[in-house]
Amino acid sequence: MCLKKFFLNTVSFINTDAIKTVLDIGCGPGHLVVKLLELEKDVTALDIAPNMLSITQARVDSMTFSSNFETILADYSAHEFDKTFDAISVMGFFDYVQDPVAVLQKLISDANKEIYISIPGDKGFLAWQRRVRYKQRNCPLYLYSRDSLVQHLQDAGCYEMTEIIDTERGFYIIIRK
């Protein structure tokens, strides 16, 4: 499952009347944000990179939406929200997470209903290639086996409410509260 498939699956799951507010963690250039605003969801876009939030904001500003939208420049792990969200989308984020259990526990507390997460797998040529590239850049990279993922979910106390879908590049996780 490539990122486009993750994106399409996440949009289809969120496209329900039960989901009204969405947090997009690591929103990048805002592709998912725009789609969710088109679906009339209230969206909070969080990213640690100011340039990504600028691109997202410009994209949103160029369109007309009736939904609420805000950006937050922050490290998700360190940010405290004054509200919870019906759904949280986490794509391309766990690659950089040193303590996945703490992040999973925070996600559970910040979500009212559902969480959609892409998790990078540790198998195959692409995983090997990423390891080499990130090592050359002296950048930490975290990849997961199915067993390590299950252990993290159990340690975070959310394994029983989790659906794990194996993909060619890793895993797509849905946590339903």
Q: Which residues does each predicted region cover?
A:
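A conserved beta-strand element that flanks and buttresses the S-adenosyl-L-methionine
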Residues: 89
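Conserved beta-strand signature within the Rossmann-like core of class I S-adenosyl-L-methionine
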Residues: 112-120
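Short alpha-helix
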Residues: 140-157
